[in-house]
Amino acid sequence: MRKKNYKGRITKRYLPKCNDICRTYDPIMTAYADLLSKREDIDEYRCNVYLEGLTEGDYTTDFLIKKKDGTFMVRECVYRSRITKPIHYKLLELSRSYWLHRGIVDWGCVINEKK
């Protein structure tokens, strides 16, 4: 989950199941986008989906994914070292409640592997 107008290093790529140009901001997002493109149960996905109506600010969710069975799932990418920090916890909880309010219960975090 990032600010809508995030100013940082960005990688832009065309990927098979992504509806638009896939913009990734870190290695976790890049690796997960590649994984989604290879999975057979995924129909399509969108990166950096704007969370409209948040009073806390303008934020985007990392991945909104549509499966072949028509259900949706949401994934947020976060580094293991940052997941326990209060601001990141607050933002992840905002994302989870935002999507739960819209009927998407399959919400989760993508975390880098333990070293």
Show where each model-derived region lies.
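Electrostatic, structured charged patches in enzyme active sites and in nucleic-acid/phosphate-binding
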Residues: M1-K115
